[in-house]
Amino acid sequence: QRTLKVSSSGPRSFSSRSFSSGPSSRISSSSYSRVGSNSSFRSGVGFGPNYGMGLGSSIGVGGITAVSVNQSLLNPLKLELDPSIQAVRTQEKEQIKTLNNKFASFIDKVRFLEQQNKILETKWSFLQQQKTSQSNLDGLFEKYITNLRRQLDSMGQEKLKLEVELGNMQGLVEDFKKKYEDEINKRTEMENEFVLIKKDVDEAYMNKVELESRLEGLTDEINFLRHLYEEEIKEMQSQISDTSVVVSMDNSRSLDLDGIIADVRAQYEEIANRSRAEAETMYQIKYEELQLLAGKHGDDLRHTKTEISE
């Protein structure tokens, strides 16, 4: 045991003390005070929730009394806790932390929503104050809508005009398309006709070449006949001269051979002249025919060339 002595001279006071041992044991002592002639002393000892024990004493007015304290009561108690209880408490602490975090987030959300609510209230009040401006905006929008409707009507009328013009243009396109097709058909026909004309021109050219060759042949033949006739005339004249010589030699017989010679000469000259005239006439006729044929083919050739150039 330990004896604690307390003096009563003058006002005194001291605070309580506490001792703890383990998670659930606690020892506490009360305070002592004295004021004036009265004095008091209180003392107490407490433990955790599972074990409890108290010690108390009081001193009234008067002298100093010795107080005895059981020293064994001041020793810490060896208390052991159940591990399951510790786990439950840890889990409860974690749950409390989680709930505290959720509660804090809820509080933040509530504050944010309150701020948004205040902002919306401010906007609403501002919009309520701006009614006159909204009415002006309504008129402005109505004018704008009216203008748009007017533009829409004008666009509709212009659309009708454009549709009419489109129909006209489509008709013109169809007409030009038909004309184009007709021109293509005409071009095809002209190309075919050109091919035929070219064949005719080629044939005419070949005929012209043939006729020119024939003309040259006939010219050569006429020249040959003319030369032949001239030679025959010369031969006949030489024969006539020989006959006249013979007749003159026989003049001793006193025959009238001069008349006979004159008649024979006249007959030969007539035959020669007639043959010459017939040959010249035949040559002239053939020459004129060839000239006409050549002129005709020349005209056809010029006409064909003109059509080809066109």
Curated annotation (Swiss-Prot):
Residues where Phosphoserine is found: S7, S9, S15, S16, S18, S21, S25, S28, S31, S33, S37, S254, S275
Phosphotyrosine modification, residue list: Y229
Asymmetric dimethylarginine PTM positions: R42
Residue(s) carrying Omega-N-methylarginine: R17, R26, R34, R42
Gene assigned in the entry: KRT8
Record note on modification: O-glycosylated. O-GlcNAcylation at multiple sites increases solubility, and decreases stability by inducing proteasomal degradation. O-glycosylated (O-GlcNAcylated), in a cell cycle-dependent manner.
Organism: Potorous tridactylus (Potoroo)
Keyword Glycoprotein: yes
N6-malonyllysine carried by residues: K102
Protein name: Keratin, type II cytoskeletal 8
UniProt cross-references to PROSITE patterns, sorted A to Z: IF_ROD_2
